[in-house]
UniProtKB/Swiss-Prot annotation:
PROSITE patterns documented for this protein: CPCD_LIKE
GO biological process, one term: photosynthesis
Domain CpcD-like stretches: 17-75
Extent of the signal sequence: none
Alphabetical UniProt keywords: Antenna complex, Membrane, Photosynthesis, Phycobilisome, Thylakoid
Gene assigned in the entry: cpcD
Membrane topology annotation: Peripheral membrane protein
Function of the protein: Rod linker protein, associated with phycocyanin. Linker polypeptides determine the state of aggregation and the location of the disk-shaped phycobiliprotein units within the phycobilisome and modulate their spectroscopic properties in order to mediate a directed and optimal energy transfer.
Compartment(s) where it occurs, according to its Swiss-Prot or TrEMBL record: Cellular thylakoid membrane
Cellular component GO terms held in the UniProt record: phycobilisome; plasma membrane-derived thylakoid membrane
Family under the similarity heading: Belongs to the phycobilisome linker protein family.
Native organism: Mastigocladus laminosus (Fischerella sp.)
Record-given protein name: Phycobilisome 8.9 kDa linker polypeptide, phycocyanin-associated, rod
Main localisation: membrane
Amino acid sequence: MFGQTTLGIDSVSSSASRVFRFEVVGMRQNEENDKNKYNIRRSGSVYITVPYNRMSEEMQRIHRLGGKIVKIEPLTRAAG
């Protein structure tokens, strides 16, 4: 079909193991995150570690909570 891409098994497994760290500012306490057992800091940055397959979902959640993503960086595993 037009617009679809076929991925091999290698590309799926490599994307499943990739992890990224979001630096977020402006998160605010609201009804959604009041369900957590901790408060969100009002000052400074919050760092959130996210697997590749959940990046879109996490970006939407951050936006709903009033946060702004200022940096996204890949986390690499130490060789060894």
